[in-house]
A protein has these predicted regions:
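Noncatalytic, typically N-terminal accessory segments of nucleic acid-processing enzymes
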Residues: 1-239
Length: 239
């Protein structure tokens, strides 16, 4: 099961606190995004971690930031009836963007860069016009934005499980695990298309058997504790 409304509100406050540790500006910008989610005429149901998806499978010589990979994921989500929001750092919403793929060759005294082609620029502009692209201000931590989206019951699409954030945002590791299982879908992109998958609710299957004494024994994992719970049910025989 996912987090309760009260727990989601607590996570939201944890995100604001995390942003404020960087600067008051970061907190103010995240609060603006919170207002955007709350007041937008659409009720978004999915949020895509843009950079994570765009760089998927790009750690090779010639790899680059690929907005069309984001589009492929957006198309799948919209086909399933989702109202989709894409979060991207502002530096990726311009005609020339950084290239942070693993094998990008930095230019002298600056980051490697790439120029988006006309199709990619038009794609970003189309999302902007539809109100489904949010440019995260420079120097702000973009992970906090898509995580915040999940507190409004959005399904997040990212292969980044935000493990670096749970200690400052979630009350416990168990709460973080429940959030991750319920709110974050991983993504794979191949020539065959896009595959979205969420981890199962339980990491282990339940087990049940009937003992020789006529008792039903059910064993199931306790989600928060990572332990196993055994229940013995004894059926009274008719005399």
């Amino acid at each position: 099961a996912g987090l309760t409304t009260t727990e989601l509100a607590s996570v939201r406050e944890g995100l604001f606190d995390a942003a404020s540790q960087s600067s008051e500006r970061d907190k103010n910008e995240l609060e603006k995004f919170d207002g955007f989610l709350r007041d937008h005429p659409w009720r978004f149901t999915a949020v895509v971690d843009g950079p994570n998806v765009a760089y998927l499978n790009q750690n090779y010589d010639g790899g680059r930031f690929r907005p069309l990979q984001i589009k492929a994921v957006v198309d799948v989500l919209e086909a399933r009836g989702h109202r989709v929001l894409v979060t991207l750092p502002a530096k990726y919403c311009e005609a020339v963007v950084p290239n942070h793929s693993k094998f990008a060759t930095p230019l002298p005294s600056q980051e490697a860069e790439q120029a988006l082609d006309e199709e990619e620029i038009a794609l970003l502009e189309a999302w902007r016009m539809r109100g489904m692209l949010y440019a995260v201000p420079r120097a702000c931590h973009d992970d906090l934005y898509w995580i915040l989206g999940t507190t409004y019951n959005c399904l997040a699409v990212s292969n980044d499980r935000a493990r670096d954030h749970w200690t400052g945002v979630f009350d416990s590791e168990a709460q973080y695990r429940r959030w991750s299982r319920a709110a974050v879908a991983s993504v794979a992109i191949s020539p065959d298309g896009v595959e979205l998958s969420s981890p199962p609710v339980h990491e282990h299957a339940s087990f049940a058997s009937i003992s020789s004494e006529g008792a039903s024994i059910a064993v199931a994992p306790e989600e928060d504790a990572g332990e196993w719970l055994r229940v013995d049910v004894v059926f009274k025989q008719n005399e």
